[in-house]
Regions:
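Nucleotide donor/acceptor-binding cores
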Residues: 39-40, 69
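C-terminal substrate-recognition regions of SAM-dependent nucleic acid methyltransferases
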Residues: 177-326, 334-339, 349-360, 370, ...
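Conserved beta-strand elements of the Class I
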Residues: 41-43, 264
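Short, amphipathic C-terminal "tail helix"
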Residues: 385-390
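Signature of N6-adenine DNA methyltransferases within the class I
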Residues: 13-14, 18-29, 46-57, 65-83, ...
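N-terminal, positively charged/glycine-rich alpha-helical extensions of SAM-dependent methyltransferases
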Residues: 1-10
Length: 390
């Protein structure tokens, strides 16, 4: 079979065409067993070269019967559609019903969808969100892999609202460092499994793995699931034992003033860590805040240099940078501390400066030792809290 992408790199980016890896296609296809009634019609609305649809057919008790009677494929690009049909003929000796239509414009009479929608933007819109919204409106259940950006931001409110109409909703989130799902695209992606069987809401945090451990990561996917906190405003990405830190109580912003003697400077370009300094850093990207008094300054210094802020950013935001909105929304925690730990942090921010060149200029940051971060975590986070700095 031919699963070679016919597009060059520029065409891939322009058209948002990234084919589903075979191992991820299997992950998605197996989740269909959760809600497939054995009778309904499945559609792959943007089948590409057929990896997803062929995998879905392959796991059936009678793949040929499934292809002939329960599968529909669609591909707007006729060149890719012809390759897919050839792949089906080679694999099963038969081809499914097929269309060369615009999925968003054409009415398909189907029950379920499995898809990897295009990732490109048109004007200010993410096309993949329209695919999700149509799937929500026309199916009893669907499985999709798409960018993680739908989890927050006002422009995706409608998408999240439609997803919430499904009583069962499970979402797996994948980071793009150090390993990545698509070898030819460095994008954070999510697998959404939405259906009407049972009532369950589950999610993962943004899963990270080293490329050499990809197989074990996939095999242990469900161990990362926790009870989900999904709202129209945000779909939180939570690991087990962290949901309790999401609450509607006091936020960091409740302890800030317009100006004071207690400033903090927070780097806004996180990769593996976020730090807050009592002094301005020699870097382009940082957020300046003023705490209202000495006690709130010290607690903020501890919280913002622990794993907590980094976890919050990964949990509620899908941006590549830390926004002031996300920073100020950090749930506030009151706890006891000793002034000695404050002195340790202030000393560490002087001794553990690191520099990375960006846009021709060295950007200063602070990388506290793991032991210090662990000590800060222990002051107000439970023992099982995810070790995000490992």
């Amino acid at each position: 079979m031919n699963f070679t992408n016919p597009y060059n790199d520029d065409e891939k980016k322009e058209n948002g065409v990234y084919y589903t890896p075979e191992d991820i296609s299997l992950v998605m296809s197996l989740r269909s067993k959760l809600f497939d009634d054995g009778k309904g019609i499945w559609l792959d609305p943007c089948c590409g070269l057929g990896v997803l649809a062929i995998t879905l057919a392959s796991i059936q008790d009678d793949p040929v019967e499934f292809v002939q009677n329960r599968l529909v494929i669609n591909e707007k690009d006729e060149r890719q559609l012809n390759i897919t049909l050839s792949n089906f003929q080679e694999k099963f000796g038969v081809v499914p019903r097929h269309f060369n239509e615009d999925f968003l414009e054409y009415d398909f009479n189907i029950d379920y969808i499995i898809m990897n929608p295009p990732y490109f933007q048109y004007k200010d819109s993410d096309i993949y969100a329209y695919f999700i919204e149509k799937a929500c409106k026309t199916t009893k259940g669907f499985i999709t892999i798409n960018p993680t950006s739908f989890t927050n931001g006002t422009k995706f409110n409608k998408t999240r609202r439609l997803l919430l109409e499904y009583p069962s909703l499970t979402i797996y989130h994948f980071d793009n460092i150090p390993g990545k799902i698509f070898e030819d695209a460095k994008v954070r992606v999510s697998i959404i499994v939405a259906h009407q069987v049972g009532e369950e809401r589950k999610t993962t945090g943004q899963i990270r793995w080293k490329s050499k451990l990809r197989k074990s990561m996939i095999e242990s996917l469900d161990t990362n699931l926790s009870d989900a906190v999904f709202t129209e405003k945000v779909f939180f990405k939570t690991f087990p034992n962290t949901v309790q830190y999401i609450h509607d109580g006091e936020k960091l912003e409740d302890y800030l003033v317009s100006e004071s003697d207690f400033p903090l400077f927070v780097s806004n370009s996180p990769r593996y860590f976020i730090s807050a300094s009592s002094q301005i850093m020699d870097r382009n990207g940082q957020i300046k805040i003023y705490l209202k008094d000495s006690d709130s300054f010290k607690k903020a210094l501890i919280m913002l240099n622990s794993s907590y802020l980094y976890w919050w950013w990964k949990t509620c935001d899908s941006s590549l940078s830390l926004t002031k909105k996300t920073l100020l929304s950090l749930p506030w925690i009151n706890f006891e501390y000793d002034d000695n730990i404050i002195n340790v942090i202030l000393h560490s921010e002087q001794m553990n400066k690191v520099y990375k060149k960006n846009a021709g200029k060295l950007q200063e940051n602070i990388k506290h030792p793991k032991e210090l971060i662990s000590n800060l975590n222990s002051l107000f986070l439970h023992d099982g809290f995810i070790k995000l700095h490992d």
